[in-house]
């Protein structure tokens, strides 16, 4: 019984250490997702190696995704303004989306678990899911590691 209490205390201490703005470098998307969920709602600051499989926009932001389906629970979304995307790609916003697909990036920023509401006629339905997002505010947060996503 005492051993169980010690193990539980150690686990809780480890979880507490993951919260906040601890700097970490992680290559596995599942590690990043787990760390962001454990630190929610604050998130985890770090440098993350991510392979981009898909991209999209809603007009207000450009989204780079590590999975083909952005709703996949294994996906991490990098969100940035169209201006930042165009500056990084050296082209217009429409071309910038496709510039990143198939590339491996080093992204510096805060990985946060975000609640995404399902909408009906523009209003939340009460149903939701979570995504992990890294918001990029300036081009210096992204470094191209490879032209091929490994």
Regions found by a protein language model. Name each.
Residues 18-150:
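OB-fold single-stranded nucleic acid-binding module
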Residues 4-12:
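Sec-dependent N-terminal signal peptides
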């Amino acid at each position: 019984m005492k051993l169980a209490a010690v193990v539980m205390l150690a686990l809780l201490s480890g979880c507490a250490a993951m919260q906040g703005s601890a700097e970490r470098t992680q290559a596995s998307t599942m590690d990043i997702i787990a760390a962001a969920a454990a630190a929610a709602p604050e998130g985890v600051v770090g440098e993350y190696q991510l392979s981009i499989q898909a991209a999209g926009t809603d007009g207000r932001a450009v989204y780079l995704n590590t999975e083909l389906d952005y709703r996949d629970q294994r996906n991490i979304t990098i969100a940035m303004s169209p201006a930042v995307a165009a500056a990084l790609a050296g082209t217009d916003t429409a071309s910038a989306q496709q510039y990143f697909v198939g590339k491996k990036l080093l992204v510096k920023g805060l990985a946060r678990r975000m609640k995404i509401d399902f909408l009906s006629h523009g209003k939340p339905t009460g149903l939701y899911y979570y995504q992990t997002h890294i918001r990029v505010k300036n081009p210096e947060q992204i470094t191209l590691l490879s032209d091929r996503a490994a």
